[in-house]
Amino acid sequence: MNGSPTPKRYSSKSSRLYDDYYNIPYQYSNPTPMNRDYNDVGSRINADKLVPEEYKRNTEFINKAVQQNKELNFKLREKQNEIFELKKIAETLRSKLEKYVDITKKLENQNLNLQIKISDLEKKLSDANSTFKEMRFPKVKDPMVDDDPVSENYDQINVPKHRAPDATGNPRTTNKVSNTSDQDSRLKAIERTLSVLTNYVMRSEDGNNDRMSPLPSPLNTISPINNRLNFQEPKRYNPTVKVNPSDDDIMMYESAELKRVEEEIEELKRKILVRKKHDLRKLSLNNQLQELQSMMDGDDNIKLDNVSKHNHATHRHSSQSSRDYSPSSDACLECSNDLYEKNRVKPENNMSETFATPTPNNX
């Protein structure tokens, strides 16, 4: 089928004069050949001579510029990715820094509060020590000096020369006695509290020292009796002996004391439990021993009843060597074995009943 747009009527089969004219390819167009090195005739064309040098230089420059542009774009993308990662890291570090700044501020405030508390406690302790010293060692006043200003003008006082022997004492002395009694009671109370505190602190300090370097036991020394007589219980650590013991030290000491008491209680419970177990075991063993003794006594009576006087002449033995002529035996060996086999059934039954574990009565 003819694919041309020309109708079929214009092409006659008789005359093929213009068929080749219409079928000439590339008549009205000049397409580029497939191989540019050759022209239509077939001769080789030198394309380098036709292209000017400026165009070649421009193309090389443009190609280099395009390649550089691609490389720079690739590097730019890498740098942008690095910048993005660094921004993420910076944000995380900034958040951590803010968090640590808040924590440091809180710790500084706590430290200031603790310092204030410590200073207050030190002041209270110094005041208490000063009052204790004043109460413990009061100033001795000069007996010739009197604090009363009236005594300075003693010439103006009319003192009677002759006093009655039954006159009451000086009211100043009575007041002084009452004041001294009150002071003594206060001093005794303070001394008691201080003694308790000092013992507490000395125990805690000695307890820590004992942990670091344990004392040798007095039983291992050369003279154990003297050491036992002169041996004193090691003092335990007590934080209150310090000048300004902290709350943590006191809490640690109290927890250690509680733990020690609990351990002692557990040890005593364990000893009591072991003692109870031993008592129960002893009771069961005593019961078992009594049953065995009763069984042995009963078996001996049965054997004595069953075994009669034996006469060797009534039995015919295989040989005379089998006879037992010992003074303690009344029968020969063969006859005694027969008697043993006959009487063995009863002891076995009794033994099975005896060796059953008895159940002790609950005390």
From Swiss-Prot:
Report the InterPro entries cross-referenced here. Spc42
Q: Which UniProt keywords apply?
A: Coiled coil, Cytoplasm, Cytoskeleton, Nucleus, Phosphoprotein
Q: Where does the protein end up?
A: Nucleus; Cytoplasm, Cytoskeleton, Microtubule organizing center, Spindle pole body
Q: Which residues form a coiled coil?
A: 62-136, 248-297
Q: Where is the composition biased (Polar residues)?
A: 170-182, 349-363
UniProt GO cellular component terms: cytoplasm; nucleus; spindle pole body
This protein's record includes keyword Oxidoreductase: no
**Compositionally biased region (Low complexity):** 319-329
Q: Region entry Disordered: which residue ranges?
A: 160-184, 310-331, 343-363
Q: Which Gene3D superfamilies match?
A: Geminin coiled-coil domain (1.20.5.1180)
Location (main, coarse): nucleus
Q: What does this protein do?
A: Forms a polymeric layer at the periphery of the spindle pole body (SPB) central plaque which has an essential function during SPB duplication and may facilitate attachment of the SPB to the nuclear membrane.
Q: By what name is this protein known? A: Spindle pole body component SPC42
* Organism for this UniProt entry: Saccharomyces cerevisiae (strain FostersB)
Lineage summary: Eukaryota, Fungi, Dikarya, Ascomycota, Saccharomycotina
